Amino acid sequence: MITSQKTLSIEASPQEVWEFLTDFPSYPSWVTDVVEAVVEAPRLERGTRINILRLYGNRRVNGVEEITEWEPLKRLRMQTPSGSFIADAIYTLKSEQGGTQVNYEVQIVGHGFSKILEWFIRGNFQKLVDSEFARMKTMLETRHVTV
């Protein structure tokens, strides 16, 4: 099993952070391996599925993530219902003075041959999460900068 946890403060309102996290088509701009994310429904809510195309090396992998918890401005939980890797990711938002605290927790379990790949992925996974969250923080905080 691969696990990661990240907590950071972002100088943006919970509304802005929530809108950013739930703008799935924009995921390729900050989530490293995502090439495309397409929402299957006209409205985001519990049960909504998102088709995600990821690029691992030269290999394109299609997958589905499902929203399993939906508490606007507070909590978003997404799970992959099937595949070589089963992921369970939780974003929790908390208003704080000057912005929003974001807590992220993820567990990924490989099945079959992918179980062997966990060992290779685990080493760099936290660095990847740290990089993506730094990118998210920069993108949200620079929205307020005027030139």
Language model segments and positions:
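Helix-adjacent hinge/juxtasegments
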Residues: 59-68, 79
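A short, structured loop/turn motif at beta-sheet edges
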Residues: 14-15, 42-43, 68-73, 92-101
